[in-house]
Every structure is written in structure tokens, then in C-alpha cells.
């Protein structure tokens, strides 16, 4: 009787975990966006269209990428969010800003470049891989805390990113 009670308790625990896992997976798949928002954004451009999705993803994760919020999105959702973060950071401050804002690992330590290639953005994927080489070789220095002056000096120190940023803007 004691053994069967223990087995029943274990099964209940695993059933609860399984239900929680399935619920989590279903919730991931059920992120919804308003059709009217998509239609409006489609008329404004591709960046705005993507933004409709990524804004919803940010809402789901509470605006923060943490170990606790990462599982709330699928790999595809993370890839689209990573693209939007990449685009915004490069457009407003380049690779140095992207890395200093804490997104280096999110972009370069995950299969982001591979997914971009699989989605058909082959030249963009190559660009991300080239930036990853610079990032990997200089990660410790690129990620260290800096004053505003030290941050601005990074743009001279890491001119290797300049050509990649220009290539991205030309895509």
C-alpha cells in the first residue's frame, strides 16, 4: 500500500508538471495579434509589420529577456524578436551599442544567424557570422561596463564593425 501510494503521488506530480508544460506550449502557440494592427502595419512597411509581432512578444515576456521569460517564446518567435532588436540597435548605435545594451549573447550565442539563413536571408546571415567573429574574439572587452566617454571610444577601437554596419544598411 505504501509503495502504491508513493507511485500515485509521483504520478500526480509528473501529471501536474506535464499539464504545466503542455499549457506553456499551448500558450506559446497562442500569442495573438490583432488583424487590424497587421493590416495597418502592412501598409506602412515591413519593419512596422514585424514590429506588430515583436511588440506582442515583448508584452508576453514583460519587456525583459531573462532566464524566466525565455521559455515563454518559441524559437521562431525568439528569432523574429532577435531580428527586431538587431535592426533597432544597429540603426541607432551599431554593434557596439547592441553589445553594450546586453544583446550580444542573445544575437551571437543563439542560432540567430543560422535561422536567418534558413529563412532565406543568406547575405544577412553571413554578415551576422562576421560580426560574431569580432564579438567572440573581443567579448570580454566589448561587454565590460564603460563610462559614456569609454563607450564613445569603442567606435574607434572597433572600426571593424563599421563595414558590417554599412553593409547592413545597404541590404
Language-model features: locations:
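Extended, alpha-helix-rich binding/interface surfaces that flank or overlap catalytic cores
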Residues: 27-92, 96, 100-108, 115-171
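N-terminal amphipathic/basic-hydrophobic helices that include classical n-h-c signal peptides
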Residues: 1-29
Amino acid at each position: 500500500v505504501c509503495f502504491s501510494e508513493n507511485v500515485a503521488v509521483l504520478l500526480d506530480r509528473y501529471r501536474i508538471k506535464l499539464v504545466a508544460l503542455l499549457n506553456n506550449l499551448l500558450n506559446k502557440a497562442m500569442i495573438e495579434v490583432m488583424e487590424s494592427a497587421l493590416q495597418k502595419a502592412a501598409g506602412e512597411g515591413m519593419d512596422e509589420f514585424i514590429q506588430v509581432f515583436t511588440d506582442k512578444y515583448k508584452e508576453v515576456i514583460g519587456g525583459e529577456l531573462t532566464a524566466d521569460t525565455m521559455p515563454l517564446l518559441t524559437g521562431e518567435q525568439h528569432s523574429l524578436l532577435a531580428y527586431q532588436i538587431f535592426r533597432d540597435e544597429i540603426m541607432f548605435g551599431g554593434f557596439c551599442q547592441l553589445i553594450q545594451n546586453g544583446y550580444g549573447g542573445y544575437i551571437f550565442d543563439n542560432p540567430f544567424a543560422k535561422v536567418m539563413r534558413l529563412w532565406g536571408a543568406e547575405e544577412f546571415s553571413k554578415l551576422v557570422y562576421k560580426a560574431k567573429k569580432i564579438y567572440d574574439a573581443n567579448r570580454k572587452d566589448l561587454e565590460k561596463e564603460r563610462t559614456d566617454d569609454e563607450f564613445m571610444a569603442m567606435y574607434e577601437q572597433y572600426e571593424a564593425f563599421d563595414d558590417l554596419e554599412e553593409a547592413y544598411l545597404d541590404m
